[in-house]
Amino acid sequence: CNKLAILNRGKIDQEYPLFLLYNKANIPGRPESIGVHTKNLSNRLINNQSKKKYNLVLKSLLKGCQLLKKSKCKFIVVPCNTAHYWYEDLKKKIRLPIINMPKEVFNHTLKKCKKNSSIGLLATEGTLKTGVYNKFFDKKYNLIYPNYILQNKSVNKAIKLVKMGDVKAANKIIKPA
């Protein structure tokens, strides 16, 4: 919230953006629910346990989206990249625009980088596992990823530091990646 207010400074209160924040910290683990819903299996879920995990996360995300819709929001932004694994199912069930963050990053990249360029993707292991960026980037760019050591020593630690609000320390740790 602070960052949103800082980036959209107003001279008076009425100039600040109106937004609603729904933060559900106890949502079931997204990374543990990934890999259970693949196109390779004709969109069939692998087994009942995997289906339950997938549906628990979907149900939790839907609850948040429905609450925002009831609050008369005009669109929804999901800041968790990994949660975009459930984007298509959310979109089908919520009659409200949901900003697709990986697609927006791709559109921005199209404006800034030549096609067929190598683009580094620094993300959580869950986001990498979902392939939510690959479906946009694979045909136009060469996505490159940190190796296992850099992922664990730099990227994962930097992401945790950002979540804790220590961006300065995260900037130092991410440099090797």
Each language-model region and where it sits:
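Non-catalytic structural scaffold of enzyme domains
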Residues: 1-177
